[in-house]
């Protein structure tokens, strides 16, 4: 199992590449390594079979093999350890000590460490990597030349000539080597596999030799795997698995077969991919030391030509190593029961004829399951390979470091410190949000929206919003009001300043300076500031474009009462007067009272709830309707001297609010210049840019920007003007048909009660416009609220009661008129005289009927015009035109009976002729006459005696009704007593 604590060192002169598996930036070294090389970390050989503890000290000899140890083959595996063992350093090596290492055998007296290590049980774990690759040496590092004779073995193949050139003490070794002809080896034909991992470096290696001991590898092991990791180079993926193929059995052949395996490396110049394992298999036929068929390690890729013996090659290599690296310190570590010979100067070997092998793809230390780690590149070489290995030192942690590369001589404390730093940085790579927080620590006041007003510093532009006492009044810390256009409140004694998150927005038509106020949804702590702004700016229309909660997130707080119970916000008292729903638009009439003020103000709240956050409404019809209603109520407020800006808010006050304001501005331009398209210059882009100069971030998303075009195109299409998408529209606005634009402004002050007739003069009778204006009729006539009682001003200092608003009354009373004041209050003492006058007039009519009814008609003074829909709300007899005249005649007769005292003004005229007016109601004047144009004069002989008659009575019944005049007079007296003054209650007509 490969540990996940892999790390690498980052340098300032590194080139970054991306790991193809994890997309993690990897540092690939571009530095040129120094001439001296280090081998601080060498691979560790761990047994994969714990029951076999015997190891063989394999020295590449020419002809003789000690078969005493070859009888117990062990399968060995190579791995590395995470624990860093202390390494033993020595400054110099002489030739005698080198010979001791070369001629080392487990049977000598100085090999106690080797014998002890043979008893160790090793973990069969897979490849483990650490910061320092440890070599457990089998020798006691004896520098005594006299002990060389005791450490000699029969496996040494050094010639006398070579030993004489090196050291005189090696004569003993040569003497022992001359006995190679003795047939001590019973298994002379046994195949020996020399499994030697080696790594080839460039001419300028960067690894320090850790030990020069020969490698002890069992001869008959099946497969050996070695992972090489180099941390001295600035690469992070110099990991390779060096696989040694099984033994190749050959009983009679004396040829040499060599199998090489390359390591998987990166593009680092330190660790080249030519490092191979050479498996030399050969046969020993009791030959002498001069045998040329012996397995000779000549280098990394040796040839099969006649080469010196193994001892000569090793001595030459060690001499060259000592001459070149004598100034460096060498570190030594213990390897359990094994030792390796590190050959680091292979390129300087004149006998090395290397054949390059293809490089494997990069393997990141973070992708342990990568197939590149376990890919093998096997080549068959004609020569035997070298028994030398070089391991790279592993660094700790897994991330880039900004520190410069360490010096060549590093201590373990520095490595531990670097390991901890790299571990922390790798954790930051796993969590990029942590790195982003750190990188943006000094940029917390940079906001996400585009700022089109080119200013140097945000602090200058949002100075008031960034003050400590005002910063908490912002719903979103990245949506702040511009300093130049923000709304400034009047400071009050309680300590509240002048700040509120709101900006003035100008229109694009004349007389539209500061026509809008774009603000955020009020917070619980800023509701009183919001109503203070409404009062100080004298606003009469509030447009809310958000819900209280959207997608599980709170977007706004309730700042107005939802029931008829009034609520207090600071120094203001809000009362919900009435509320009507129309096409997903809630229209609420609010009464705003202020402490110290006598009379309230009426504010209309338009709440549209079908606009999604950061999106666009499903259709443009509702937004067009909302725009018409806003302008209508704005003009109505102007008539009441509350012509303040239209307050528009959503949640943040920039996205939906900016979209609606842009639509309303362009619709106003179309309305103003609709009849003259040459002056109408509509540019959505310029409009949005102007909005963003006044408040930052207006129109947030692309969908909202496209929705503006959609709505304006629909308006232009209805107007008969080509749409904005038409190419000809860009040149000029050509009229397809001359259709006047609906006018939204009201030139004259509107009456107290609105009817559809009041808007016919200013708005064309289109379907959408009539539907949008019907809400005003609902607000004024067909209210869903019960009759409201008179509300007292809680802040009033006088005892004067505030009369209810005219919008709350469903019936209109007749205004006061002196001419009609007394007839509605008849005294009882005049009843007798009236009855006598009625009897006399009836007798005169029977004796002398009038010849012309129209000539003697009497007209009464006109009354103030009233709408018939209020006077006859409960009338249900207007089925057809034929019955309408009879109904009006009966109603007029009943009115005459109720107000019979009015007859003393008639100067005893008994002729009640037809007035000739139409039978559709009252046209400008209130006439107490019959409207039957086709009946005879006898139909109205007794106008005060028709109470007991049916609706379809004839002229023959009039004489019978005259007999009951006395009884009717008494009944009229009782009815006249029940009549009340119009000051108290309105007239009820049935």
Swiss-Prot record:
Which gene is transcribed and translated to give this protein? ptpC
Q: Which GO terms describe its cellular component?
A: cytosol; endosome
Keyword annotations:
Cytoplasm, Hydrolase, Protein phosphatase
Question: Which SUPFAM superfamilies is this protein grouped with?
Answer: (Phosphotyrosine protein) phosphatases II
Q: Which Pfam families match?
A: Y_phosphatase (PF00102)
Mostly located where? Answer: cytoplasm
Where the record annotates domain Tyrosine-protein phosphatase, the positions are: 422-715
Tell me the GO BP annotations in alphabetical order. Answer: calcium-mediated signaling; intracellular signal transduction; negative regulation of receptor signaling pathway via STAT; protein localization to nucleus; response to differentiation-inducing factor 1; response to osmotic stress
Can you say what this protein is called? Answer: Tyrosine-protein phosphatase 3
């Amino acid at each position: 199992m490969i540990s996940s604590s892999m790390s690498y060192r980052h340098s300032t002169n590194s080139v970054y590449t991306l790991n193809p598996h994890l997309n993690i930036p990897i540092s690939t070294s571009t530095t040129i390594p120094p001439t001296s090389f280090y081998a601080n970390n060498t691979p560790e050989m761990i047994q994969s079979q714990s029951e076999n503890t015997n190891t063989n000290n394999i020295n590449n000899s020419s002809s003789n093999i000690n078969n005493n140890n070859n009888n117990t083959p062990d399968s060995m595996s190579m791995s590395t350890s995470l624990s860093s063992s202390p390494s033993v350093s020595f400054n110099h090596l002489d030739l005698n000590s080198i010979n001791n290492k070369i001629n080392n055998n487990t049977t000598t007296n100085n090999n106690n460490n080797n014998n002890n290590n043979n008893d160790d049980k090793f973990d069969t774990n897979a490849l483990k990597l650490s910061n320092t690759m440890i070599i457990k040496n089998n020798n006691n590092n004896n520098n005594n030349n006299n002990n060389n004779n005791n450490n000699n073995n029969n496996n040494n193949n050094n010639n006398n000539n070579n030993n004489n050139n090196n050291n005189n003490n090696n004569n003993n070794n040569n003497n022992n080597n001359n006995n190679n002809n003795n047939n001590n080896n019973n298994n002379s034909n046994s195949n020996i596999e020399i499994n030697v991992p080696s790594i080839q470096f460039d001419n300028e290696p960067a690894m320090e030799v850790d030990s020069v001991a020969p490698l002890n590898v069992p001869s008959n092991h099946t497969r050996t795997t070695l992972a090489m990791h180099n941390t001295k180079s600035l690469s992070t993926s110099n990991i390779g698995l060096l696989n040694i193929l099984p033994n190749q059995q050959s009983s009679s052949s004396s040829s040499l077969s060599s199998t090489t395996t390359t390591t998987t490396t990166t593009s680092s110049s330190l660790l080249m991919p030519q490092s191979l394992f050479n498996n030399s298999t050969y046969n020993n036929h009791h030959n002498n030391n001069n045998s040329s068929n012996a397995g000779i390690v000549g280098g990394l890729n040796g040839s099969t030509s006649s080469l010196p013996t193994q001892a000569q090659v090793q001595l030459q290599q060690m001499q060259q190593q000592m001459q070149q690296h004598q100034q460096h310190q060498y570190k030594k570590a213990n390897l359990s029961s094994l030792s390796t010979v590190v050959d680091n100067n292979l390129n300087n070997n004149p006998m090395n004829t290397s054949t390059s092998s293809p490089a494997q793809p990069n393997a990141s230390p973070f992708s342990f399951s990568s197939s590149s780690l376990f890919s093998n590149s096997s080549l068959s070489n004609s020569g035997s390979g070298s028994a030398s290995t070089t391991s790279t030192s592993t660094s700790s942690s897994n991330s880039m470091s900004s520190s410069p590369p360490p010096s060549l001589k590093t201590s373990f404390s520095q490595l531990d410190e670097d390991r901890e730093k790299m571990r922390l940085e790798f954790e930051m790579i796993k969590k990029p949000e942590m790195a982003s927080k750190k990188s943006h620590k000094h940029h917390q006041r940079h906001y996400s929206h585009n700022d089109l007003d080119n200013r140097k510093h945000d602090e200058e532009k949002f100075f008031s919003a960034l003050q400590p006492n005002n910063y908490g009044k912002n719903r979103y810390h990245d949506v702040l009001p511009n300093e130049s256009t923000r709304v400034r409140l009047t400071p009050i004694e309680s300590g509240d300043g002048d700040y509120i998150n709101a900006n003035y927005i100008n229109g694009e038509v004349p007389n539209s300076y500061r026509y809008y106020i774009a603000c955020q949804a009020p917070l619980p702590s800023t509701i009183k500031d919001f109503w203070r702004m409404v009062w100080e700016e004298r606003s009469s229309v509030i447009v809310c474009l958000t819900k209280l909660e959207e997608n599980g997130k709170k977007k706004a707080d309730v700042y107005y009462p939802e029931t008829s119970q009034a609520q207090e916000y600071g120094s203001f008292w809000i009362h919900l007067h009435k509320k009507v729903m129309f096409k997903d638009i809630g229209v609420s009439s609010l009464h705003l009272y202020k402490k110290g003020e006598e009379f309230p103000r009426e504010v209309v709240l338009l709440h549209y709830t079908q606009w999604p956050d950061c999106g666009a409404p499903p259709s443009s019809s509702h937004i067009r309707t909302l725009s018409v209603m806003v302008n209508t109520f704005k003009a109505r407020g102007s008539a009441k001297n509350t012509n303040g800006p239209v307050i528009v808010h959503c949640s943040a006050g920039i996205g939906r609010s900016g979209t609606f304001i842009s639509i309303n501005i362009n619709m106003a331009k179309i309305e103003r210049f609709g009849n003259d398209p040459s002056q109408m210059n509509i540019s959505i882009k310029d409009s949005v840019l102007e909005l963003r100069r006044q408040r930052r971030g207006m129109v947030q998303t692309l969908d909202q920007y496209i929705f503006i075009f959609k709505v304006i195109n629909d308006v232009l299409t209805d107007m008969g003007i080509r749409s904005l998408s038409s190419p000809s529209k860009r040149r000029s606005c050509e009229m397809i048909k001359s259709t006047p634009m609906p006018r939204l402004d009201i030139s004259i002050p509107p009456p107290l009660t609105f009817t559809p007739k009041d808007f016919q003069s200013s708005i064309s009778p289109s379907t959408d416009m009539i539907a949008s204006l019907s809400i005003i009729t609902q607000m004024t006539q067909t209210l869903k609220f019960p009759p409201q009682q008179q509300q007292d001003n809680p802040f009033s200092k006088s005892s004067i009661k505030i009369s209810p608003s005219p919008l709350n009354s469903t019936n209109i009373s007749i205004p006061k008129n002196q001419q009609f004041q007394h007839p509605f209050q008849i005294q009882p003492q005049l009843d007798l005289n009236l009855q006598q006058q009625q009897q006399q007039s009836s007798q005169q009519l029977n004796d002398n009927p009038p010849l012309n009814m129209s000539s003697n008609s009497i007209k009464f003074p006109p009354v103030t015009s009233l709408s018939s829909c209020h006077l006859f709300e409960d009338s249900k007899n207007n089925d057809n035109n034929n019955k309408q005249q009879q109904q009006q005649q009966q109603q007029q007769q009943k009115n005459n009976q109720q107000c019979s005292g009015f007859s003393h003004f008639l100067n005893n005229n008994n002729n009640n002729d037809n007035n000739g007016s139409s039978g559709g109601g009252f046209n400008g004047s209130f006439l107490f006459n019959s409207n039957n144009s086709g009946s005879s004069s006898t139909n109205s002989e007794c106008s005060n005696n028709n109470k007991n008659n049916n609706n379809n009575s004839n002229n023959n019944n009039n004489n019978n009704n005259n007999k009951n005049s006395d009884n009717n007079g008494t009944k009229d007296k009782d009815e006249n007593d029940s009549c009340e003054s119009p000051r108290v209650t309105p007239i009820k007509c049935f």
